[in-house]
Curated annotation (Swiss-Prot):
The virB operon is essential for intracellular survival and is not involved in the invasion process. Constitutes a major determinant of virulence in mice. The keyword ATP-binding does not apply. Belongs to the virb1 family. Residues 197-238 are annotated as: Disordered. The lineage of its organism: Bacteria, Pseudomonadati, Pseudomonadota, Alphaproteobacteria, Hyphomicrobiales. It comes from Brucella abortus (strain 2308). Transcription is turned on at the beginning of the stationary phase of vegetative growth. It holds the Pfam family SLT. This is Type IV secretion system protein virB1. Keywords: Virulence.
Length: 238
């Protein structure tokens, strides 16, 4: 396992690690398999890479718009970065894409707000979330705005992320004497369910790994183009 701030420094070097951590806390709670459905809701989040990929493929086939991975990159941004679903669920690759989107938002915001670093950063958060500099500041009854949530997470305690470590010729002492561990059966490649009423305040019912995605008769919500554009120069976001 790798500390998130270390991973962020390696994979998203143009964004301050604590800034990236605040966004990730709000977007996915540091869950690399998270999927956020626009106009819908998964009754539970995928618990494995296979399940996450299958769920994303099922949602795409049914015309749903969604964001995925640790930084919740919108599906329509994946072709821009040459990313597959499997790659988008990789924490490092997802952070890299998310940081480029945020970087572009910040670049455009600071042009509009010269000398206002923190103001431009908050505008960039709005851009990351809504694709513009205003949508992320809007509040809902009883709920803070997206920008307020990110700012409130500035001192979040980050979680370590599981990644494959570098091989070493000398094994760990414990590994050299450890008995083989019985492998768990892999998760079903079926995806999880979608609840079309995300406004409900009650907790979603727990789905089952072997249940296919079931959608009601409503059509997926139509949305504007996803936020973020590719960048050309190196800009550090604070």
């Amino acid at each position: 396992m790798v500390p998130f701030l270390v991973l962020a420094q390696q994979c998203a070097p143009t964004v301050a690690p604590q800034t990236m951590a605040a966004i990730v806390q709000v977007e996915s709670g540091f869950n690399p398999y998270a999927i956020g459905v626009v106009g819908g809701r998964l009754v539970r989040q995928p618990v494995s890479l296979d399940e996450a990929i299958t769920t994303a493929q099922s949602l795409e086939a049914k015309g749903w718009n969604f964001s995925l991975g640790i930084a919740q990159v919108n599906r329509y941004n994946l072709p821009k970065y040459g990313s597959t679903y499997a790659q988008a669920f990789d924490p490092c690759k997802n952070l890299k894409m998310g940081s480029k989107i945020l970087e572009d938002c910040y670049r455009r915001a600071i042009v509009k707000m010269p000398g206002q670093e923190q103001g431009a950063l908050r505008a960039a958060f709005s851009c990351y979330y809504a694709g513009n500099f205003t949508g992320g500041f809007k509040t809902k009854p009883g709920s803070p705005s997206y920008v307020q949530k990110v700012v409130a997470s500035a001192d979040v305690t980050t979680k370590p992320i599981v990644v494959v470590p570098m091989i070493r010729k000398t094994p760990d002492a414990a590994a050299a004497v450890a008995a083989p561990v019985k492998k768990r059966q892999p998760a079903d490649r079926n995806s999880v369910l979608v609840d079309l009423h995300p406004s409900s305040q009650s907790m979603p019912a727990t789905g089952t790994a072997n249940a296919p995605v079931r959608l009601k008769t409503e059509q997926p919500a139509t949305t504007d183009a996803p936020p973020g554009k590719d960048n050309t120069d190196g800009v550090v976001v604070f």
